[in-house]
């Protein structure tokens, strides 16, 4: 990372100054190799995380704990965080800059297409987010929404990026794009649970799985066989509140979670560009989520 001091002069007098921390990297994409960092293919894997990214009992963590967070992420063999719904904090992104963790940064969304003043508000927010974070080398993806938007809106978001971040080497896109005209207008496409992935999309730009392993169980129980639980009952999960055959995401033990994590990651690892399935879809994937707090029940 490098620090540059920017100074503002008026009539020869210094009015203001700011030190900007930034970094340099070359970003590209090859349909047969995936995302390229400094011309080297990089398989992006990691977690989808709420932008609050709080610590259990502490809440919003101090900056040194953000660095602990980043080191733990790296130690888990991950190199990517996708923030969900709204932009991650400056402190988180600064930490990812320091530790080399790729970031997908949204602005804001409504879980669906919106219009009129609501859409203009999202555009204004994306403008502000790009200005605030465009010097952060860890950000490779700007996310225009958590659900599909139309071709005109995608073009509008790309125009903002081209104007305010023309040399950042970043991709502008959206989750659950599934029509060819919008895909052509985007620079990357996000999927959820491997829906809508296709080779023609990967030939256009990166496909990123945005949040597999959407489990929402408390995981208080280690396994089904140790007392006093013996296949514990849940209030809402499964038929009659009992665990069903297969993966019931509302009634997972810690043992179930480990198996589901391996199964989920294996799906996208095999479907990655160059993977064993030969589908050649994915450039990256993110599991939901990296956290030790409630995260809205997740």
Q: Where are the regions that the model predicts?
A:
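N-terminal carbohydrate-binding accessory modules
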Residues: 5-73, 94
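Substrate-binding/catalytic cleft of secreted carbohydrate-active enzymes
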Residues: 64-297
């Amino acid at each position: 990372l490098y620090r540059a001091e920017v100074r503002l002069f008026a009539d020869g007098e210094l009015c203001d100054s700011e030190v900007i921390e930034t970094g340099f990297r070359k970003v590209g994409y090859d349909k047969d190799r995936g995302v390229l960092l400094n011309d080297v293919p990089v398989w992006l894997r990691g977690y989808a995380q709420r932008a609050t990214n709080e610590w259990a009992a502490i809440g919003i963590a101090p900056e040194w704990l953000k660095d602990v967070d980043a080191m733990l992420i790296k130690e888990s063999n991950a190199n990517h965080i996708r923030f969900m719904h709204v932009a991650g904090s400056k402190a988180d992104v600064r930490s990812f800059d320091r530790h080399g963790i790729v970031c997908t940064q949204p602005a804001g969304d409504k879980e669906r297409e919106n219009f009129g003043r609501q859409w203009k508000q999202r555009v204004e927010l994306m403008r502000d987010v790009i200005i605030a974070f465009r010097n952060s080398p860890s950000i490779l993806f700007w996310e225009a929404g958590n659900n599909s938007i139309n071709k005109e809106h995608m073009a509008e978001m790309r125009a903002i990026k081209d104007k305010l971040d023309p040399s950042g080497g970043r991709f502008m896109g959206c989750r659950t794009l599934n029509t060819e005209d919008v895909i052509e207008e985007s620079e990357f496409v996000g999927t959820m649970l491997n829906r809508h992935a296709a080779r023609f999309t990967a030939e256009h730009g990166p496909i990123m799985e945005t949040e597999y392993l959407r489990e929402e169980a408390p995981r208080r129980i280690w396994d089904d066989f140790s007392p006093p639980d013996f296949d514990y009952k849940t209030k809402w999960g499964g038929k009659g509140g009992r665990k069903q055959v297969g993966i019931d995401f509302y009634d997972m033990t810690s043992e179930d979670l480990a198996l589901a994590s391996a199964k989920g990651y294996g799906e996208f690892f095999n479907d990655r560009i160059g993977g064993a399935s030969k589908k050649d879809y994915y450039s990256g994937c993110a599991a939901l989520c990296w956290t030790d707090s409630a995260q809205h029940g997740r």
